[in-house]
A protein has these predicted regions:
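Active-site-adjacent loops and short helices of periplasmic peptidoglycan-processing enzymes
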Residues: 26-190, 194-203
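Intrinsically disordered, low-complexity sequence elements enriched in Ser/Thr/Gly/Pro
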Residues: 1-4, 69, 73, 224
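Sec-dependent N-terminal signal peptides of Gram-positive bacterial secreted proteins and lipoproteins
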Residues: 2-25
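Domain-terminus/edge residues, biased toward the C-terminal soluble/receptor-binding domains
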Residues: 169-170, 181-186, 190-248
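Proline-rich low-complexity regions
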Residues: 21, 48, 77, 177, ...
Length: 248
């Protein structure tokens, strides 16, 4: 658990700084420059600026914000939307549930969409789908998880927004489970950090987030196994600047 929390501290800074500005989607001023807000706190260690417009670093145990640059500004969260999809899914399902792919999921199997080439009628476990969601960023898995858990995709999206409000998010609204572009789909660095921190309280969430590799065995529709590997440098430990304890 401690290693996962250490990893969270690093990944939060990365994920939240990678959020794309909503200004490309909605009526928000372009090229807004934000200062490092935590540098304004008297006696607080002064941090260097980051290249990203916004970013946040949060302590997973206490929720203390250690670094904040435009953390409350709305941004298009792209695929880190799937962090909330994962949280709502693990809170409302079990890993061994059988998920049958329908048109809802398979319609996302396109050349310009990250997917696992699922097929209508194909059956996988929820555990398979969640690993495809996180390691492969599979949009077909995201949509199918949503329908399976929520009954309909829209019901699941409503669950995502309700859960975000419960966690304390104030600059977040989801319109889909995968992070596909929509002018009404947005979050902030702080809100996503709150969501991630909430997820760490759940053992199944931690298990999925902590896996760098996963294999889906042959299914009723596919004879080949699907092997997933994360290429994230913090997991792969190939860079001398990362401490091993943080990326185990």
């Amino acid at each position: 658990m401690r290693k996962v929390k250490k990893l969270f501290t690093l990944l939060t800074a990365l994920y939240m700084s990678l959020m794309l500005p909503v200004q490309v989607m909605a009526a928000v001023e372009l090229n807004t420059k934000y200062e490092v807000d935590t540098n304004k706190i008297q006696g607080w260690p002064q941090a260097a600026d980051i290249a990203s417009d916004t970013g946040i670093l949060m302590d997973a145990d206490t929720g203390t914000v250690l670094f904040d640059k435009g953390g409350d500004q709305q941004r298009y969260p792209a695929s880190i939307t799937k962090i909330m999809t994962l949280l709502v899914a693990v809170e409302n399902s079990s890993m061994d549930e059988q998920v049958t792919f329908t048109e809802t999921g398979v319609r996302n199997v396109t050349a310009d969409s990250s997917n696992i080439n699922s097929k209508i009628g194909e059956v996988m476990t929820m555990q398979d789908c969640l690993h495809a969601l996180i390691i492969q960023s599979a949009n077909d898995a995201a949509a199918q998880i949503a329908e399976h858990v929520g009954g309909t995709e829209q019901n699941f999206i409503d669950m995502m927004n309700q859960r975000a409000a419960q966690i304390g998010c104030t600059n977040t609204h989801f319109t889909n489970s995968s992070g596909l572009p929509d002018e009404n789909h947005y979050s902030s660095a702080k809100d996503m950090a709150l969501i991630f921190r909430e997820g760490l309280k759940n053992e199944a969430f931690r298990s999925v987030i902590g896996d760098a590799d996963y294999t889906i065995k042959p299914t009723n529709m596919t004879s080949d196994k699907r092997v997933f590997h994360t290429h994230h440098i913090m997991f792969r430990n190939t860079n001398r600047f990362y401490d091993q304890g943080y990326i185990h």
